[in-house]
Amino acid sequence: MRRTGQLSRPRLRLCATGHTGSLDTESRGLHSELVMELLAGNVLPDDAGLRAFDALSSYVGVRTSLVAARLHDLPSAKDTESLSHPRAGGGAVRTQALPYANSEAGRHPRFHEIIAALLPLLLGGELLLWVVLVPVGLRGQADFAMFYTAGYMVRIGQSGQLYNYDVETRYQNQLVSKTPAPYTHLPYEALLFAPISFLSYRVAYWLFLLVNVGFAIFAVLLISPAGSGWPSAVILASFFPVSAAIADGQDSIMLLTIACAAWLLFSKKQESLAGGLLALGLFRFQIVLPIVGLMFLWKRWRFLAGFAPCAALVLVFSGWLAGFDQLRVYGSHVLSLGAVAGQETGYSLSTSQSQRMVSLRALFTNILPNGHLAQIITLLASIALLIWVASRGRILDRKHQFALAVAFSVLVSYHLFVYDLAILLIPMVAALELTGHAQSRAAQAAILIPLLAAPVGILWRPFLLALPLLAFLFVITCAFRTHSEQVGEELVEERSYAALDGVPS
């Protein structure tokens, strides 16, 4: 490149000021002109200016890699293998590694080392969890008992009595155990368990456990970013809520698989299909509806157009299966779960249950002396978070919007236990993909927070998990926004570079 001009230190300082956002309109115009001249190769800095630019680089980072390449007469950030090669035409080139010129510089191998170091401890805790929960499940004292009983009732034509506590308890005592576990999900889900009700309870428990393991593996295979197979597998194997859901015979892994498939479709711009698929997860409406609410605020109309008719079909089918009057009964049961001491037999939320929940509602219910005050504070906090997440997530791409909506949904969920946190694998895997980019510390922290907080919450006071979940939401929002801003600025640079070289962007 022929040196056609000199860019002095004062002008580079002006360039630096422009990146801090403190220039007036006239100066911003001059700054933009300088950047374009640098990209075009019409001006090059003198030695003093080059030193000033190097000082600037520590702040600018990856955002001006193309400018840096032109200043140093080097290849762009997309081709960094020749950074230490001699300058064409003679003369040695500066070989100081630019933090933004090499994507590997943004990688943090120590993060994988941290995960590997924590793995024995986490897997040891997982093993203990399985040793405790599997015998409980085999004795009929796990939540799988309610699914098995509900499936049996649908199979023998008693679906109209699914929410009759006395009838359900009688069947459960005959088939499983005398530990009451009332069915609290929509009727359509009970139909899924009708086939395995032909088997004995213990055999059905083992079969569903294996099915859940298969669903979990399939879910991770769906969403794992390229080249990160083993970290995704490690997170799956060491994330306590996943094991808790499988060992307890819960349907949270089914929801995880549905949500992962919906996330994949949504990321590929198939929003209608994603919305329709997510509607099948309405058996966990307390998680699905907050996601849908954010999609409404983000004006994802195609997603809503797919969700609405499928959700209506789910409700109509449930009404046909169990009777539409049973949907009203189901609604009253759900409202009964909303009180610390509900009025309906078998469906009240006991104090011990509220202490085992993990959402904001559980946190305020347990730390505030008045139940009504806790509900008001929960509502206000949830609305405030909804507004904040909606505004912060508006600029994100589809993939990160959906993942952020999932992180938000578990925090404001109406009724949520530790095993329901399995769906957090979606934002955790999304954060895992960002650990290979520059400025990825927030993404790394976002992965570690639920990974480490979940086992502590299980062993101590689960309702306090709302605090690290809140931190998780803030940190992962920061990680997603930082990535979005970097991608946006790099895209502007690439288009400017392509335009200057006469290549369509």
Residue ranges and their predicted role:
Residues M1-S82, R87-A88:
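Cysteine endopeptidase catalytic domains of the caspase/legumain-like
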Residues D73, P86, G90-A92, Y100, ...:
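Non-catalytic N-terminal targeting/anchoring module and adjacent flexible stem/linker
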Residues L432-S505:
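Aromatic-enriched
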Residues S272-F285, L289-F296, A405-V412, L448-P455:
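Membrane-interface alpha helices of multi-pass inner-membrane proteins
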Residues A116-A117, L191, A237-S238, G281, ...:
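Hydrophobic alpha-helical transmembrane segments of integral membrane proteins
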Residues F283-Q286, L313-F317, A442-A445:
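Membrane-embedded alpha-helical segments of transport systems
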Residues M1, D73-S76, G91, A341, ...:
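Short, low-complexity, intrinsically disordered N-terminal modules
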Residues R94-L273, M295-L425, L432-E433, V487-L491, ...:
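Primarily membrane-embedded glycan-assembly and transfer machineries that use lipid-linked glycans
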